[in-house]
Amino acid sequence: MNIGKIVQIMGAVVDVEFASEALPEIYSAVKVTVPEKKIDLTLEVAQHLGNNTVRCVAMSSTDGLQRGMAALNTGAPITVPVGPATLGRIFNVLGKAIDNGEEVHTDTSYPIHRPAPAFVDQDPSTVMLETGIKVIDLLAPYSKGGKIGLFGGAGVGKTVLIQELINNIAMEHGGLSVFAGVGERTREGNDLWNEMRESGVIDKMAMVFGQMNEPPGARLRVGLTGLTMAEYFRDVQNQDVLLFIDNIFRFTQAGSEVSALLGRMPSAVGYQPTLATEMGALQERITSTRNGSITSVQAIYVPADDLTDPAPATAFAHLDATTVLNRAISEKGIYPAVDPLDSNSRILSPQILGEEHYKVARDVQQILQKYKELQDIIAILGMDELSEDEKLVVSRARRIERFLSQPFHVAEVFTGSPGKYVPIKETIRGFKEIVEGKHDNLPEAAFHMVGTIEEAIEKAKALGA
């Protein structure tokens, strides 16, 4: 009774007719299997058209489909495996392993469409998540259960920063990570997989990919697949989970394609009219509960660098912190190339972080801002034209700039310097001492690529020798 037949195929959208009593619900999975043609396709019901026909979105290529083919109503949404068995593996949007390994068998599967945690289950407290990365912890700290936007062009170090976060959460907090590759390059996913294996972090993370070559249905849903796997670790294993989404813009882009295929009237700039709803349904599930938390780091591509474009603008509304990577900083050889003045965080306040942290962070930003304003004068007239106070600001700013860099564990194989995890107390103490002028006598080079302030002092001795 629950078998229907395909009546129309329009690219990635397929119409299926069922008997009136067997009509599948919205978001139900419908399977089309034709072994002799090697077709094994899953569709997701998106609309009821009337006349016992449903309109579905395909999760993989519709090549080879024909009208009249049988389609099975599974009676449930797309469900994916969850649990410890998913760690160290790569999945597609349907939860099938795509890393040429053996099939993943888990005791539990979750549907990818799930309600966000109820208000009473959410944890109202705001707690900082220590990353061990100085520039982030000091100036744009992450909150547990928060959402962080990661902005940066090609080749400024987004992936390395993501890898270091995964490494630090695994090593220092014993936490797990889920990486969702949404509509990005397959080559980048492959590189990430190989680098994760080399750095030994792969056993602490699950990876889900729906890349550029996949139909829009897969790219629209793969974020939910990754989020569902992360929810299991939060709700059942009481973990603090890191969820990486690369790239949240492609999620919106896929939604726009699906919306057009479904015949919906476009909204501003041609985006789907349901843009805010779709984004909200994904983002509201990313939160802290009384059991654990999901902290999400989302790479955000900004089309034509226009921050008012509806896609990035809708994502901004959900963010708690932004980490902006700047090419000018990476060109100076300062890594991570996080812009200390452009990056910000909602939790950078004395009520949450304490007076000392807040004051040191603001003092550091003030010195860097003054240095930025003086750079034109320095470029035209040179350092000699500055007053003594201004010269002092410049010398401290240059030390701070270098001290904001640090060697990463995951980049050890390239740099040859062992990675450093810096606790927040050490970070605050180090910058406080530089701001107060305790280390004005040390050479600038001593502050570059070190962890704590003690290491800078040791490096200065070595340079002096």
From Swiss-Prot:
Its GO CC terms are: plasma membrane; proton-transporting ATP synthase complex
Q: What is its EC number?
A: 7.1.2.2
Q: Where does the record say this protein resides?
A: Cell membrane
What is the membrane topology here? Answer: Peripheral membrane protein
Q: Which reaction does it catalyse?
A: ATP + H2O + 4 H(+)(in) = ADP + phosphate + 5 H(+)(out)
Keywords carried by this UniProt record:
ATP synthesis, ATP-binding, Cell membrane, CF(1), Hydrogen ion transport, Ion transport, Membrane, Nucleotide-binding, Translocase, Transport
Query: Which sequence ranges are marked TM in the entry?
Result: none
- The UniProt annotation places ATP binding at 152-159
UniProt cross-references to InterPro entries, sorted A to Z: AAA+_ATPase, ATP-synt_VA_C, ATP_synth_F1_bsu, ATPase_a/bsu_AS, ATPase_alpha/beta_chains, ATPase_F1/V1/A1_a/bsu_N, ATPase_F1/V1/A1_a/bsu_N_sf, ATPase_F1/V1/A1_a/bsu_nucl-bd
State the similarity comment.
Answer: Belongs to the ATPase alpha/beta chains family.
Protein purpose:
Produces ATP from ADP in the presence of a proton gradient across the membrane. The catalytic sites are hosted primarily by the beta subunits.
> What protein am I looking at?
ATP synthase subunit beta
UniProt source species: Desulfitobacterium hafniense (strain DSM 10664 / DCB-2)
